[in-house]
UniProtKB/Swiss-Prot annotation:
Record organism: Mus musculus
This protein's name: Hyaluronan synthase 3
Glycosylation sites: 463
Biological process according to GO: extracellular matrix assembly; hyaluronan biosynthetic process; polysaccharide biosynthetic process; positive regulation of DNA-templated transcription; positive regulation of hyaluranon cable assembly
Family, as annotated: Belongs to the NodC/HAS family.
Gene (name only): Has3
Lineage, opening ranks: Eukaryota, Metazoa, Chordata, Craniata, Vertebrata
Gene3D superfamilies cross-referenced by the UniProt entry: Spore Coat Polysaccharide Biosynthesis Protein SpsA, Chain A
Length: 554
């Protein structure tokens, strides 16, 4: 069968499959068919809930199977090309980084157990206030003939003040020379954003290495992270990129970082592990990822010059990098055997801005990703449809309940959300062997109250660019993220007041259900609050080097 015909059939097939999945979920939602229900529908279980429950069950099953496969992958690495050892370059993107985090990052890079690993750190900024990062580079990795640096007035796409065309070309050659000649190199360049920084590292390396590992400057790497990701790429030539397990370095600094830590574990070890089973991980995270350099150099220019609705894209760099690999028909994988720790926002507003930026890139890349559904397993199509449209179904459900339901319906909805969260959290406790994962059930409320409006705001402002979150040396508070959250809270409170005003007096049965549900919900929150305070009290006074992961060195 001709290749063009096969491709056309796959495109038609995956498109029809996506429509069937979306149509099925929509039909189940609209019809509201219920399998069982009590008198007056105080309690019920319907088709829509069954579909979501089945999705979680299947996702958890394949995640478990992928983890079992990972545990069997501990045999010695056999390189396909015995004549020449594989070469790897670690590219670190740095922007106004907290000095302590940067030191930890560079020290961890120095301890990576891989021979002749090349480390390239590119600093986004060449002003006087940025030189402290070069000083830290000299402190940790400098002082030997293997280290080199260059302070560049320009970058590859924008000339600095006083630069001529000749001096710009000379600067480009100097950057390449420093990177090629040095085991450890640091390039300071004119500010241009994270994508510009990553481009400089990739462009300067050219075809000098086999694989490129990416890392953020707030990341602490496990010494075995490189060899474990390399193992995945070497064992299957059809795998173009692989990501590792990203955990939180500052998880006990605040409640938001603590909840983020359990959410991170769930996202990587359940959601991405499931995607990895089918070879279609949709985002290789910036703190820990590795790509075949031969592929990366193919799409480097297209990746850098990406546009959306006529505007140049300056966020979602890692997700688009992953999508470019998928667009070539190569598989993307995840391995929990490769680990790192990374910083996460400890303040609500900074976390909200980060989530809004990630949501922007998610929806934009969802559209791009849909062009390549036909090149991969049907799971990629199915999961993209479910996760892409789920927030909109949830928003419609919440608004309908708060404006057309009863007080009991609202309380039951909250209880159901927490019940689903508890089920997922219990499975995570079993999979990880850590009771702290029970707090994953609280993240569902954070999702409902903050992430839903942030996603809508992200769609409305999808063409707004920038780093999204400020550098960590100087934290800049951006209150714009509070606007959609405030509107959402006002909508919900208005619906609650309207429902309470319109509802008739409670019957004895309704009152009993309402009081019982409220007491149960309150006890649940009190129990988790006490557990959280106990965990924090136990951690109080412990130093960072006592964290469970040995590579989290100060």
């Amino acid at each position: 069968m001709p290749v063009q015909l096969t491709t056309a059939l796959r495109v038609v097939g995956t498109s029809l499959f996506a429509l069937v999945v979306l149509g099925g979920i929509l039909a189940a939602y609209v019809t509201g068919y219920q399998f069982i229900h009590t008198e007056k529908h105080y309690l019920s279980f319907g088709l829509y809930g069954a579909i979501l429950g089945l999705h979680l069950l299947i996702q958890s099953l394949f995640a478990f199977l992928e983890h079992r496969r990972m545990r069997r992958a501990g045999r010695p690495l056999k390189l396909h090309c015995s004549q020449r050892p594989r070469s790897v370059a670690l590219c670190i993107a740095a922007y106004q980084e907290d000095p302590e985090y940067l030191r930890k990052c560079l020290r961890s890079a120095q301890r990576i157990a891989f021979p002749n690993l090349k480390v390239v750190m590119v600093v986004d900024g060449n002003r006087q206030e940025d030189t402290y990062m070069l000083d830290i580079f000299h402190e940790v990795l400098g002082g030997t003939e293997q280290a080199g640096f260059f302070v560049w007035r320009s970058n590859f796409h924008e000339a600095g003040e006083g630069e001529t065309e000749a001096s710009l070309q000379e600067g480009m050659e100097r950057v390449r020379a420093v990177v090629w000649a040095s085991t450890f190199s640091c390039i300071m360049q004119k500010w241009g954003g994270k994508r510009e920084v990553m481009y400089t590292a990739f462009k300067a390396l050219g075809n000098s290495v086999d694989y490129i590992q990416v890392c953020d400057s707030d990341t602490v790497l496990d010494p075995a992270c490189t060899i474990e990701m390399l193992r995945v790429l070497e064992e299957d030539p059809q795998v173009g990129g692989v990501g590792g397990d990203v955990q939180i370095l500052n998880k006990y600094d605040s409640w938001i970082s603590f909840l983020s830590s359990v959410r991170y574990w769930m996202a990587f070890n359940v959601e991405r592990a499931c995607q990895s089973y089918f070879g279609c991980v949709q985002c290789i995270s910036g703190p820990l990822g590795m790509y075949r350099n031969s592929l990366l150099q193919q799409f480097l220019e297209d990746w850098y010059h990406q546009k959306f609705l006529g505007s140049k894209c300056s966020f979602g760099d890692d997700r688009h990098l992953t999508n470019r690999v998928l667009s070539l028909g190569y598989r993307t994988k995840y391995t929990a055997r490769s680990k790192c720790l990374t910083e996460t926002p400890t303040r609500y507003l900074r976390w909200l801005n980060q989530q809004t930026r990630w949501s922007k890139s998610y929806f934009r890349e969802w559209l791009y990703n849909s062009l390549w559904f036909h090149k991969h397993h049907l799971w990629m199509t199915y999961e993209s449809v479910v996760t892409g449209f789920f927030p909109f179904f949830l928003i419609a459900t919440v608004i309908q309940l708060f404006y057309r339901g009863r007080i009991w319906n609202i309380l039951l909805f909250l209880l159901t959300v927490q019940l689903v969260g508890i089920i997922k959290a219990t499975y995570a406790c079993f999979l990880r062997g850590n009771a702290e994962m029970i707090f994953m059930s609280l993240y569902s409320l954070l999702y409902m109250s903050s992430l839903l409006p942030a996603k809508i705001f992200a769609i409305a402002t999808i063409n707004k660019s920038g780093w999204g979150t400020s550098g960590r040396k100087t934290i800049v508070v951006n209150f714009i993220g509070l606007i959609p959250v405030s509107i959402w809270v006002a909508v919900l409170l208005g619906g609650l007041a309207y429902t309470a005003y319109c509802q008739d007096l409670f019957s004895e049965t309704e009152l009993a259900f309402l009081v019982s549900g409220a007491i149960l919900y309150g006890c649940y929150w009190v129990a988790l609050l006490m557990l959280y305070l106990a965990i924090i009290a136990r951690r109080c006074g412990k130093k960072p080097e006592q964290y469970s992961l040995a590579f989290a060195e100060v």
